[in-house]
Amino acid sequence: MENNREGPYSVLTRDQLKGNMKKQIAEISEIFSLSKPDATVLLMFLRWDSHEVSEFLVENNEKVLSESGLKPVVVDPNQDLYKISSCGICFKTCDDGDYLISTPFCSHMFCKSCWRKYLEKNFYLVEKTQTRISCPHGACQAAVGPDTIQKLTVCDQEMYVEYILRSYIEGNKVLEIKYCPAQDCNYVIEFHQKNHDGADQEDYGFNVVCLCGHIFCWRCMLESHKPVTCNNASDWLFRDLNSLSKESGEKPLSLSSFETREKTYPLSSIKATKKVCPHCLRPADLGTKQYLRFLTCACNGRFCWKCMQPEEAHKTESGFYKFCNVSMTFEGRAPKTLEGRAEPENSCVGLWKASEVSLKQAKSDLQAFEESNIKNPSDLTEKDFTIIRKGLMLIVQCRQVLKWSCVYDYLHAEYEMSKREYLRFLQADATSLVESFSKTLNEEIGRASSATYENFCCVKHKVTIETSNIGNYFYHFIKTLQEGLDDVKVKSYDDYGGLFWLCDRCTYGNTWFHKECLMCSDDIAARVDLSDMSLN
């Protein structure tokens, strides 16, 4: 769905990553006739850059070996190495000289217990990896490599291997490698910088699809959030969504606040003289003019204050006003009040929640398909299985895009109402397309389980074509949103310049410091005089 080019990353297991690391060590060892422990120390010291290692070994061999700790340390001629029987840290005496261990480049001897404490405290349990592990002796720069570690316990050796692998992942300046952020996932992602188009992905990042099924943004490591930027996604998850969902999130709307679209109004400020406009669901205030029968909201909608029906419902064919029936409802529904109002289904939070339900269902369908194939292997080849799985995986991606398009909707200013309406149209069209594709795919999966090979060839071709079509559709859907829906003009005010922007709804001039129209966002609706209406 991103595009048709080769993916800029590879999904690897830890064993595959270890294999790549060992291969790199073996190449340096073979080319420059170094031992593998020394090659490991050199690569770790130069942050796994084989090209830089080659240059240093060719141009200044002695210098790089000395700086990395691979040159022997000058031993005190008066020191008798055979008489050393005590640890250099804890000073415990050992009868067996083999119990004390030193590096191949110095004569500083330490017991296994002190080696473990030193390595754990300064390297293994430290969050940031170092480019070199040196001898525990304070002034000694001798390198500690695999040949020294293999003299320690098995547990110490395993911890060292994990540390080297962590250095390969976190300290690698040639390859960009990250763990998949999904819970209980052990896959790692290797990023190919040569395929990366940094300018296009600077703000939005790009989606990574792990083999575990998790889709996330490489740049910020949050779940995939296109078409919004990484900063917008972070603000939404950790600030905006929390504030918007305090009363209308997982629980029913409480009486402590009233949420309408993106703005929250405390109920303490909404008096008995306020009701919800049946046209735009905004608070409308009758104020001191309680003798008025009809009220004009900021959205230009007029309604009866008693029965909440539109003004047209009170007119006869001759144009005269008739008595209103308070028991009547607006369009067959009960009058809306602030206390009993539920969250609008078309609000950003409501759409977000509905999209999350659909996304969970798509992930559940994908997991069910994989588990059924493991428990009850079918006659499908690996290629056929991949085609169907790719279609189910695409549905998950599309559902995630639709989910985050709700945040894109939330970010639009009030004066971009035309773009918002067009966005809602695109969302509805995309949702319909995904649902149709999902239904078709489930039908074809059912046929594939019982179809002959000849019939499945037709099924496979149909799934492949539709997967390609919907992938291209959503690629352009994302691109259209990221470009800001430029094809839609917000009336004539898009080209208006100066110190103010004009609201698309009421044409009020707002300063550029205000994202929402000050007039329309006011919780007090516009009021009309007696001269503006007829009273019975």
UniProtKB/Swiss-Prot annotation:
Annotated segments matching region TRIAD supradomain: 83-328
Protein name (Swiss-Prot/TrEMBL): Probable E3 ubiquitin-protein ligase ARI13
Broad EC category: transferase
Co-factor: note: Binds 4 Zn(2+) ions per subunit.
Cofactors that this protein relies on: Zn(2+)
Pathway(s) of this molecule: Protein modification; protein ubiquitination
Sequence positions that bind Zn(2+) 4: 217, 220, 225, 230
Binding residues annotated for Zn(2+) 2, in chain numbering: 106, 108, 135, 140
E.C. number: 2.3.2.31
Top-rank lineage group of the source organism: Eukaryota
First and last residues of each zinc finger (IBR-type): 158-230
Keyword Metal-binding: yes
Residues given in the record as Zn(2+) 6 binding sites: 304, 307, 314, 324
Chain ranges of zinc fingers (RanBP2-type): 495-526
Gene that specifies this protein: ARI13
Comment on protein domains: Members of the RBR family are atypical E3 ligases. They interact with the E2 conjugating enzyme UBE2L3 and function like HECT-type E3 enzymes: they bind E2s via the first RING-type zinc finger, but require an obligate trans-thiolation step during the ubiquitin transfer, requiring a conserved active site Cys residue in the second RING-type zinc finger. The active site probably forms a thioester intermediate with ubiquitin taken from the active-site cysteine of the E2 before ultimately transferring it to a Lys residue on the substrate.
Residues at which Zn(2+) 1 binds: 87, 90, 111, 114
GO BP terms: protein ubiquitination
Zinc finger feature spans (RING-type): 87-140, 277-307
Family: Belongs to the RBR family. Ariadne subfamily.
Annotated keywords: Metal-binding, Repeat, Transferase, Ubl conjugation pathway, Zinc, Zinc-finger
Pfam families per UniProt: IBR (PF01485)
Organism: Arabidopsis thaliana (Mouse-ear cress)
Job description of the protein: Might act as an E3 ubiquitin-protein ligase, or as part of E3 complex, which accepts ubiquitin from specific E2 ubiquitin-conjugating enzymes and then transfers it to substrates.
Catalytic activity: [E2 ubiquitin-conjugating enzyme]-S-ubiquitinyl-L-cysteine + [acceptor protein]-L-lysine = [E2 ubiquitin-conjugating enzyme]-L-cysteine + [acceptor protein]-N(6)-ubiquitinyl-L-lysine
Residues the record lists as binding Zn(2+) 3: 180, 185, 210, 212
